[in-house]
Amino acid sequence: MANHKSALKRIRSNEKRRVLNRYQHKTTRNAIKALRLATDKSDAAAKLSTVISMIDKLAKKNIIHDNKASNLKSKLTKHVAKL
């Protein structure tokens, strides 16, 4: 266990960030799943812009790596174009 006040505070703040990051990542994963299950091209195209925005926000906050974000966006764009 931590012995310093600053270390105890860091433990508390890390837990708060972990929960928030986990929520944002899970929400984005659910949106990606919904996009992949979409069968209508216009519906999927509408969802694509919001999903790409969510992915960019995760990458900006270093929740996911920049390259993973690029790969996801590329694959999802190809998927929507193929519909």
From Swiss-Prot:
One of its GO terms (biological process) is translation. Keywords: Ribonucleoprotein, Ribosomal protein, RNA-binding, rRNA-binding. SUPFAM superfamilies: Ribosomal protein S20. GO terms for cellular component: cytosol; small ribosomal subunit. This is Small ribosomal subunit protein bS20. GO terms for molecular function: small ribosomal subunit rRNA binding; structural constituent of ribosome. Binds directly to 16S ribosomal RNA. Belongs to the bacterial ribosomal protein bS20 family. It comes from Flavobacterium johnsoniae (strain ATCC 17061 / DSM 2064 / JCM 8514 / BCRC 14874 / CCUG 350202 / NBRC 14942 / NCIMB 11054 / UW101).
